[in-house]
Amino acid sequence: MNIKIDASRVAGLITGSANLDKVVYDTWYLKDVELMSGKIYGLVSEYGQGCMYLSYLLGGKIDFGDLQIFIDGINVSKEDLKSISWNLEPSKEKYKNKTVRKSIEKSIIKNKCSDTFEDIVEAFYLDERRHDIKLQYLSGERWRASAALGYVSGKSIFYAPYKNTSFYHSMYGSNMFKALRYLADKGTIIVLPVGSDTFIKSVVDECIYLDPVYEQ
């Protein structure tokens, strides 16, 4: 899968702004972007300078305006993106109150997934002691469990809210990146918004830099 964001038709206003998660206001200085399946991307910008905007744009959460987005050469809509995307952070999503086991087992059946629950537990490093806990109440395992649910739901794009470098560094020892690599190897796209490339560049396939360039 190849995703192209075309900003060439944007006239006048060069920025896109949006209220995200009701607490974050983010502005992206629009530019062309291309992403390929099978990769984990770090979306790098200062807080409020576009990394979360682009993440949620790919998640089908933001109106395109004059932007055009193409998947494998086909012009797609916000709803098209929403139907194939999955938020790694469940706390703002409808599935936050679902338990790990029941939600995954139901989705396996609904989507006729060839994997068993045991396969998913192994692939995403899910702790059996937390199988009956609601996703929003998980701590270090929350993103892995959400990723597992998105995977068995057949999603192709996995996006996330802004997190700082220390968050990703702490998650490195929790098997989160092993789970995300499993997703990427299955042909999905993962985007991780962060304020600096200090650590993230060592664990993702590519960084996309979004901070505006200021003339001096």
Sequence positions of predicted segments:
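ABC ATPase nucleotide-binding domain signature region
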Residues: 36-111
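A short, flexible loop at the N-terminus of ABC-type nucleotide-binding domains that lies
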Residues: 1-32, 36-37, 63
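ABC ATPase nucleotide-binding domain helical subdomain, centered on the C-loop/LSGGQ "ABC signature"
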Residues: 105-124
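Conserved ABC nucleotide-binding domain
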Residues: 120-139, 154
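Conserved catalytic loops of ABC-family nucleotide-binding domains
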Residues: 38, 153-158, 165-201, 206
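Glycine-rich phosphate-binding loops of nucleotide-dependent enzymes
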Residues: 44-45, 55, 63, 149-155, ...
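GG-anchored amphipathic helix commonly corresponding to the ABC/SMC/Rad50 NBD signature/C-loop
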Residues: 139-162
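Conserved switch/coupling elements of ABC/ABC-like ATPase nucleotide-binding domains
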Residues: 208-216
